[in-house]
Amino acid sequence: TPTPEKGIGAIVALMFMMLFLGPIEEFGWRGVAQPLLQRHFAPLWAGAIIGTVWGIWHLPAFFLSGTVFAAWNFFPFLVGNITLAILVTPIFNSARGSLLWPMLFHWQLINPFWPDAQPWDTWILIIVTGLVVWLNRRTMFARQGSATAVCSGEAKEEA
């Protein structure tokens, strides 16, 4: 992403704004939905469900002119959201339900210093997600040990 004409101050302001806009979604995705879904589904499937809803949540942006979404295809975006939600699932569970790491993960996705998305990014995400799921297969396919407390101060794990 090139530096805006107004200088570095504009990019710092944008980063500060993005620190709240995207990551605030994590209160809903990981703070509420993930723990509730993990009470009934293995973390892998909870993440896949969240990723699907997360992608659909952004669907209206694809119809707004002037947004980056307007130039993208929805299907690769949806697949990317599903893989990202699955990727953040072991982060969330390893952090015992803390929202800090998922929020930082979300923020780095929309960080204006990263290069623009490329068509092959989805394939890279699929490969990385497959590897992460395989490396965490004991915890990704079983509800035991997953965080199930909803936005509480102390996270609880499914016994």
Question: Predicted regions span which residues?
Answer:
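Juxtamembrane helix-entry segments on the extracytoplasmic side of multipass membrane proteins
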Residues: 1-15, 66-80
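Membrane-interface helix/loop boundary segments of multi-pass membrane proteins
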Residues: 24-51, 93-98
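Structural signal for the C-terminal ends of transmembrane alpha-helices
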Residues: 23, 92, 130-140
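Functionally important transmembrane alpha-helices
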Residues: 72-131
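Aromatic-anchored segments of alpha-helical transmembrane domains
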Residues: 51-61, 106-115
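Residue-level hotspots within the lipid-embedded alpha helices of multi-pass solute transporters
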Residues: 18-23, 51, 55, 77-82
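Hydrophobic/aromatic residues in alpha-helical transmembrane segments
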Residues: 20, 33, 84-88
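Membrane-interface capping segments at transmembrane-helix boundaries
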Residues: 134-152
